[in-house]
Amino acid sequence: MTSHTLTSFGRQISSPVIVALDYDNQDTALAFADKIDPQDCRLKVGKEMFTLHGPQFVKLLHQRGFEVFLDLKFHDIPNTTARAVAAAAEMGVWMVNVHASGGTRMMTAAKEALLPYGHDAPLLIAVTVLTSMEQSDLQGIGIDMTPAQQAERLAKLTQACGLDGVVCSAHEAQQLKKVCGQHFQLVTPGIRPTGSDVGDQRRIMTPEQAVLAGVDYMVIGRPITRAADPAAALRQINQSIAGVINAR
């Protein structure tokens, strides 16, 4: 697991937690952001909030000192995807993603679009299999593989295209680290502290289990954003993760 990264704001963020800002209201999302420390996590902006509020919302988070994962899962023809990824880089986001199922030409074009940004380029990762999907869902779209098999196949393709890592289930993390190496970044949604509502996720793990599986970054939403004390909930998760790391 990545122990820390130096942020564009000159600080170190030791936490692997990315908090999903799954709101439908900008004021509510910013009120949440104002309750937590940018050194304790990063923030994920997804399709709903970005469609509602656009780049200005990302700018407001940057002004508060947060690094942003722009989770728009681009999946289009190579040129369109490349231009979208470059636009994300222009916004100064920390991480952006595409769908690995877009294929080699699309992912390669996206990676090449970031070359002019050098060390300032965001991390570029690809989505393998959505954590809401089970084998029956894959069969329904003509893929005769288990989620783990499909995730491994797409992770290898992603790495061959030069991307930084993948979004995957924590259940696939150990195998993907084995086949893609320790430096290949794994970002996992479907992380729920013990006792949390699993929502619409199907393949989930606790933060502690995710660390032991080799996850680099974990996306956690409602257990933090809907907590009575979000800052305390985030601190508790970070402490539990640190305890596992220190015990290794």
UniProtKB/Swiss-Prot annotation:
Function: Catalyzes the decarboxylation of orotidine 5'-monophosphate (OMP) to uridine 5'-monophosphate (UMP).
Family named by the database record: Belongs to the OMP decarboxylase family. Type 1 subfamily.
GO MF annotation list: orotidine-5'-phosphate decarboxylase activity
CDD domains: OMP_decarboxylase_like (cd04725)
The protein, known as: Orotidine 5'-phosphate decarboxylase
Assembly with partners or alone: Homodimer.
Catalytic activity: orotidine 5'-phosphate + H(+) = UMP + CO2
Cellular component, GO, one term: cytosol
Lineage of producing organism: Bacteria, Pseudomonadati, Pseudomonadota, Gammaproteobacteria, Enterobacterales
EC class name: lyase
UniProt record, GO biological process: 'de novo' pyrimidine nucleobase biosynthetic process; 'de novo' UMP biosynthetic process
Pathway recorded for this protein: Pyrimidine metabolism; UMP biosynthesis via de novo pathway; UMP from orotate: step 2/2
EC number(s) from the headed UniProt entry: 4.1.1.23
Catalytic-site annotation from UniProt: 73
Binding-site residues, substrate: 22, 44, 71-80, 131, 192, 201, 221-222
Record keywords, A-Z: Decarboxylase, Lyase, Pyrimidine biosynthesis
Domain of life: Bacteria
